[in-house]
Amino acid sequence: MAVIKMKPTSPGMRGMVKISRDHLHKGEPYAPLLEPQFQKSGRNNNGHITVRHKGGGHKHHYRVVDFKRNKDAIPAKVERIEYDPNRTAHIALLCYADGERTYIIAPRGLEVGATLISGSEAPIRVGNTLPIRNIPVGSTIHCIEMQIGKGAQIARSAGTSATLLAREGTYAQVRMRSGEVRKIHIECRATIGEVANEEHSLRRLGKAGVKRWMGIRPTVRGVVMNPVDHPHGGGEGKTGEGRHPVDPWGNLTKGYRTRNNKRTQVMIVSRRKK
């Protein structure tokens, strides 16, 4: 993939950096795997805003991606690699030997025409999915399950991966890109390799309108609001917070730990690096 630096023909184009999609499929997506995607704009069933800074954006269909990869011992051929507007990673369309087609997260180095397979007997090759107990220690993996049979939840974004560090009994230790080391059951599945589109982090939007196309509305700082709207608001002229930083509801932010799931705390061997 190539990085395209746009010429400064307008203020919005100045500084804009795009990621080339020349290697991706040019036609329409596979229609049977499309579902309607309804814009909620951050509102709940009462119409109240529950997630701020959401609304608008370009319409798109949801691509149904197979995160379980549980069609064991059936080879699948990569028909094409496509752009997915719902995620940073690219997706690959697989055609199984029995005729079924599914989308998967495209790993780095996957080429059209390659053959993939899932199951405990699958070879250690990029794009193949196996239980963690069958993956060699030290391997780079992505699309990792956290619960057996639930489907991949870890390392699904562009350029992400994890490293299998060790196996102890029924659990394996996996180090994520954040530095967190977590215990995962050895019967959970993972895919060999790392996610493609690693240049995504080099993208520069160039103008505010691109954010609006993505369905992201402006974020206003609390210090420029009125006291009725935010704890940081008010004051004569330009002032600071005057207190420890908090969110609009008064909860501490900027470093305050918010993790509240004590049930799975024992699965974290070491916390992520700041």
From Swiss-Prot:
A Pfam family recorded for this sequence: Ribosomal_L2
Entry annotated with the keyword RNA-binding: yes
Biased composition annotated in UniProt, kind: Basic and acidic residues: 229-246
GO cellular component, one term: large ribosomal subunit
Disulfide bonds, paired cysteine numbers: none
NCBIfam families: rplB_bact
Family (UniProt): Belongs to the universal ribosomal protein uL2 family.
Listed name of the protein: Large ribosomal subunit protein uL2
Organism the protein comes from: Polaromonas sp. (strain JS666 / ATCC BAA-500)
Gene this chain is encoded by: rplB
